[in-house]
């Protein structure tokens, strides 16, 4: 029987990413794991609905044996079986992030025995999670360059706290994974400001994009009033398309926060990204660790190595025979991954 990997959910930033990465890697490598202290670093520790949905989705896709899969649980034991392609549908039952559930199971389906379609119902535009737009416009184009055939479609927008959204991804097994090198982003080609409004007055979006335009006069502007009963909700994004990649910065309107304050938050994040010579933003850096590790090669630059990034690297190195090296130079950090020496 494979050795059980023991993981401390309180390590590093102590959030749900440790669990999601462990589930992905366990399915792919066939190595079981035990985790204690799940989300110990959070105000409400243990499994929330979104995390529980990710566990149950992983369980269904690989026929795993699992203990501890209940709301509030801080311990989990997961013993995977073979990954099975097919049609899957999961409902979070709250506004928890569809994207984080998808990102847990999709890497395993890159290695499935056939094509798959995964549909998840819940939140599509959440704070502290990649939005559906980020997945479609930023992450998946980079995966395609690595040889991964995956396409996500936003079925319906879902905002916190109501949820009610849905997204579906069609994924084909990858024949092989290529590394990716993102050292410089190159020249900025296009900038687009977009406000999404669901049961929120149109003038809110107009004020948001007008404020962003003051920071980025060259930005194209787009205000989208969503229909179909989703909401209330408001998301403002700034998409920066460069020669080597696309980045997306998002902030969410909340009661008591002005449209101008939301726009200034997006502008601050985007300006901080553009002020650094690094190619990759802080959140995208987190999303690249797992695919690059599975490819066994690659490199990118990021302005700083966040606790989230370092925690994710530590988990990946427990499951895969790879080594990450981080080097600081010229006001940024270069992250490199390589396969471990077979003799080491």
Curated annotation (Swiss-Prot):
Q: List the catalytic residues.
A: 308 (tele-amp-histidine intermediate)
As its record notes, the protein acts as a catalyst of: a 3'-end 3'-phospho-ribonucleotide-RNA + ATP = a 3'-end 2',3'-cyclophospho-ribonucleotide-RNA + AMP + diphosphate
The UniProt record lists the EC number as 6.5.1.4
Q: Which UniProt keywords apply?
A: ATP-binding, Cytoplasm, Ligase, Nucleotide-binding
Which class of enzymes does this protein belong to?
ligase
Q: Where does ATP bind?
A: 103, 283-287
So where does this one cross the membrane?
Answer: none
Similarity field: Belongs to the RNA 3'-terminal cyclase family. Type 1 subfamily.
Q: What is this protein called?
A: RNA 3'-terminal phosphate cyclase
Source species:
Salmonella paratyphi C (strain RKS4594)
- State the organism's lineage: Bacteria, Pseudomonadati, Pseudomonadota, Gammaproteobacteria, Enterobacterales
